[in-house]
Amino acid sequence: MPHDPSFAPTQLAARAAYLLRGNDLGAMTTAAPLLYPHMWSWDAAFVAIGLAPLSVERAVVELDTLLSAQWSNGMIPHIVFANGVDGYFPGPARWACSTLSADAPRTHQTSGIMQPPVHAIAVQRILDHARTRGRSTRAVAESFLDRRWDALVAWHRWLAECRDQNDNGRVTIYHGWESGMDNSPRWDSAYANVIPGDVPEYQRQDNKINTDASQRPSDLEYDRYLWLVEEMKAARYDDELLPKAVSFAVEDVFVSAILSVACQVLAEIGEDHKQPDADVKDLYSWAQRFRTGVITTSDERTGAARDYDVRADRWIATETVAQFAPLLCGGLPHDRERALLRLLEGPRFCGHPDLAYALVPSTSPVSRDFRPREYWRGPVWPVMTWLFSWCFARRGWAERSAILRREGLRQASDGTFAEYYEPFTGEPLGSMQQSWTAAAVLDWLG
């Protein structure tokens, strides 16, 4: 797809739909055709959101495929590997999940970690679209909910029980990949304390596909990423052993906010569709617990949220998109929330005078950690724009939501459907033809 900055909404929607069809392997959609040729967990949820206005039935298939690879302990793995597809590292042999863990599925090859739990939002969007269709389409969506309700609750229960063992109301991650924000400055200090041992030899694939080194993590960073995988493998991915076995452990405030929102959304779905009262009660309880956990981290003056390094026993305060986690789940005192909104909309983030679009950069342009081309250290991610816009609409902030949608569509109108964008120039970066970027556009255009 050649770069063209002038696609009208109807053209853009058609191109986005064409992209998703092109990335469709039948029962799963690749995150991107070259760099990410498999199914990623939170990508799949966003893909389902984009598929829903095109075909509720196909959106259901996407989530069905993902949930069919769920571990028996409830975890949804961050990658479900497509059969017969190579070209990605680390692949299933490196993870060795089915060999090491009794919880891993035997019918699918997966990774051994998770990603942010946005899936309930996808279920909500599928049900929203199904309500506007015929009876048979509504039946497909409702049948999916009945069939997968237990799996969805088990996923949230696993996060609440196995990843918040101290009841702090915050999800502990054991790898930066679990955050979805792989190389964010949020993890710099925690990764600095990861001392790689004897990492088995490996060949990266990502920097062969995207050859601009300024856009990808370094080899030293990859050594640390892979050493953490080795530590998890040594613990056989056991939920009881990971807290002691892995040298990276951080309470992730952004994932915690997403979990709070997801539990609230799923509880409301459960009430509307007469699911078991005990499940609904648990979901509401978890939503409140993680909302409180997020709010507890916030700065009293600015409202900015912080992560917590469990290994170093200290708070991590960074000028990244994650500090706005309380705006997703709510719960801040009014004055503190207004202060956090001023920070978001001011010159340190969306109001920075040099931004091409008034969107949230992954790291503040005024931070010393800011790198405008490098992954989660500066670029603007359309999928983050979508998430903030959706959460703001849910919270009743219609104008703020509409501004993000408008600016997000302006950015995406180049038609590249890039993974992320340079915040000052608007240059598309990372993987092109990224499925979740197309999905965001399709949901915005409805």
Model-derived features with residue positions:
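Extended glycan-interaction surfaces of carbohydrate-active proteins
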Residues: 2-38, 66-106, 170-250, 289-380, ...
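Extended, well-ordered alpha-helical scaffold segments
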Residues: 5-15, 55-68, 134-160, 262, ...
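TPR repeat positional signature
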Residues: 44, 48, 116, 120-123, ...
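Alpha-helical support elements that line or immediately flank enzyme active sites
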Residues: 44-74, 322-333, 385-401, 405
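Core register positions within helices of long alpha-helical scaffolds
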Residues: 50, 122-125, 129, 262-265, ...
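Hydrophobic/aromatic-rich effector regions of fungal transcription factors
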Residues: 100-132, 387-391
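Internal, well-ordered domain-core segments that constitute the primary functional module
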Residues: 115-191
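Long, repeat-rich segments with strong aromatic
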Residues: 245-289, 370, 374-399
